[in-house]
Every structure is written in structure tokens, then in C-alpha cells.
Design a protein with these regions (language model features):
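Anionic N-terminal interaction surfaces
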Residues: 1-27, 98-99
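Acidic, Ser/Thr- and proline-rich intrinsically disordered linker/docking segments
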Residues: 40-123
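Short, compositionally biased strand/turn segments
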Residues: 22-41
Length: 123
């Protein structure tokens, strides 16, 4: 996790990290950070972050028989304002986990977060 520490904001704390099929995902106290290794060697890397307060929907697909991986799809508000008169922009991020990883606990955490955000935004 040390190699990713430079991408943290001041006083941001890592709660948990995951090595995915090709990427690394960190969940901090503020956001979800996806380190997308690209190219044949994985030297090139794209870094995306999703503010935890913007997560509004989560879906999961467990691995089946064979070579399938498990997936968690995170839908989040990507526009700067959560309540915009002209509507908000929604984006989706798919995280692919190795077959052996049990995604249930992470799914539950993200779903509880999405539900709390939905309630807060719609008050």
C-alpha cells in the first residue's frame, strides 16, 4: 500500500485495500480510489476516485462455475452538485474481483453507504 500513499489527501486514512484482477482499489475514510494498471507491462496507470458521499447504487454479480470473476458495480453522482435543477450526472464503475474473493462484506458496506446517501440526498 505504500506505493499508493502519495495519492492520498492530507489526513486521509486507508480503511481497506483490494488487489483486483488487474487493478488495486483502496477505500479510505473519504473516497474509493481505483488504480487502473494499463498496457502490457502495467507501468502506465490511471487513477480515479469516487467520493463516498456520492455513491447512490451498488450491484453485485458473483462468480459462476468456470473462469468467471465476481463484479461489483458502483453507481455514483459525478456532477459537482447532488441536487441540480437541470439534473445530475450519474457514472458507473465496475470492479472485477478474483473468483476466490468473497464480495459479500464489501457489497454490504457499499450498499449501506448508498442507502444512507440516498436518504441524506432526498431529505
Amino acid at each position: 500500500m505504500q506505493e499508493y500513499g502519495a495519492y492520498l489527501m492530507t489526513n486521509e486514512k486507508i480503511n481497506v485495500g483490494f488487489k483486483l484482477v488487474r487493478d488495486v482499489v483502496l477505500i479510505t475514510d473519504k473516497r474509493i480510489i481505483d488504480f487502473d494498471k494499463q498496457g502490457a507491462t502495467g507501468q502506465k496507470m490511471r487513477v480515479d476516485s469516487i467520493n463516498l458521499s456520492s455513491v447512490i447504487h451498488v450491484s453485485a454479480e458473483t462468480s459462476g462455475f468456470g473462469l468467471d470473476d465476481s463484479e461489483i458495480n458502483i453507481h455514483y453522482i459525478s456532477s459537482p452538485y447532488f441536487k441540480a435543477n437541470g439534473g445530475v450526472s450519474i457514472a458507473e464503475k465496475k470492479l472485477e474481483f478474483p473468483k476466490k474473493y468473497n464480495i459479500q462484506q464489501l457489497y454490504r458496506f457499499l450498499q449501506e453507504l448508498a442507502y444512507a446517501n440516498h436518504e441524506r440526498i432526498n431529505q
